[in-house]
Design a protein with these regions (language model features):
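Charge-rich alpha-helical segments
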Residues: 1-65
Length: 65
């Protein structure tokens, strides 16, 4: 999923919220910053080589932020 922000500070604050959720779940997304104000989040369980329930749960938490 892609997110756009007005400032880098807003992006960083949102990324910190995602990191906090990810740490609580011990399940971490791939995050890429594009053009300083765009954040791309990818959820995939690499050791299972598929999208799992944990990915869906983390996606729900991210969507609720």
């Amino acid at each position: 999923k892609n997110f756009k922000f007005k400032t880098q500070t807003e992006l960083a604050q949102f990324l910190l919220k995602i990191a906090t959720c990810a740490d609580e779940m011990n399940h971490h997304p791939d995050c890429k910053i594009h053009k300083a104000f765009q954040l791309e989040i990818t959820l995939f369980t690499h050791d299972k080589n598929e999208i799992t329930d944990l990915d869906h749960q983390l996606a729900e938490k991210i969507n609720s932020l």
